[in-house]
């Protein structure tokens, strides 16, 4: 038998695939939750890009922009019933707070911080005042999985390493925007230095063992 070829689908997976067969047992409510989970990453990517554009161009978000954001999600392929099922009001408020604070603090969005090919990362929003010796890093979370401040400590350490500014030479504030709340942390120089030491030590270990191979 000559089977039909679906070249455009090769290497891709259906939203409800055979390998994730548990959807066979779903009722409509469970199916809706499953689909919301399936689209969560895509929604996060879209919202991050909206935030990036607004912070970059210094255009604040207002409550009346909620429908515009919803329209962007729809235009990017997110089903309307998924948007209705998630806490979109809370999600938009969280996005608005993150964007407007980023603009207020004159931050730069999506900045890559690099130490080596083994250690680099992208800060959602970052600003550094050479006058005040103050580092500010904000992270935006669109999902509900509990965030950890360690991620931002790594960014602070990467900043220190890339720009050769010792942790004791600057103060910092780290923020995570998630589920309508803001987690604040003012790390000590010792906290950041501990991460710096770990990064440099692990980088040497990786490079040494890679060279041996």
Task: Kindly give the residue locations of the regions a language model identified.
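Hydrophobic, Leu/Ile/Phe/Ala-enriched alpha-helical segments that form helix-helix packing faces
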Residues: 54, 95-99, 159-163, 206
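Internal catalytic-core helix/loop-beta-alpha segment
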Residues: 86-129
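N-terminal interaction/assembly modules
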Residues: 52-56, 101, 213
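Nuclease catalytic cores
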Residues: 1-89, 107-111
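Nucleic-acid nuclease catalytic cores
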Residues: 111-197
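Charge-rich, solvent-exposed alpha-helical interaction surfaces
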Residues: 91-94, 198, 205
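Accessory terminal regions of nucleic-acid processing enzymes
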Residues: 204-213
């Amino acid at each position: 038998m000559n089977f039909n070829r679906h070249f455009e689908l090769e290497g891709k997976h259906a939203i409800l695939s055979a390998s994730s067969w548990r959807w066979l047992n779903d009722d409509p409510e469970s199916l809706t939750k499953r689909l919301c989970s399936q689209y969560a990453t895509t929604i996060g990517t879209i919202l991050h890009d909206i935030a990036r554009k607004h912070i970059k161009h210094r255009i604040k978000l207002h409550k009346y922009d909620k429908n515009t954001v919803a329209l962007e999600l729809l235009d990017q392929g997110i089903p309307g019933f998924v948007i209705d099922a998630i806490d979109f009001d809370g999600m938009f408020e969280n996005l608005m707070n993150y964007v407007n604070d980023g603009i207020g603090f004159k931050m730069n969005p999506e900045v890559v911080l690099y130490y080596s090919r083994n250690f680099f990362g992208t800060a959602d929003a970052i600003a550094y005042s050479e006058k005040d010796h103050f580092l500010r890093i904000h992270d935006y979370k669109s999902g509900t999985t509990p965030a950890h401040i360690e991620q931002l400590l790594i960014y602070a350490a990467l900043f220190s390493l890339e720009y050769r500014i010792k942790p004791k030479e600057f103060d910092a504030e780290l923020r995570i925007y998630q589920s309508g709340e803001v987690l604040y942390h003012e790390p000590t120089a010792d906290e950041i230095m501990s991460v710096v030491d770990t990064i440099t030590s692990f980088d040497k270990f990786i490079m040494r063992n890679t060279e041996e191979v």
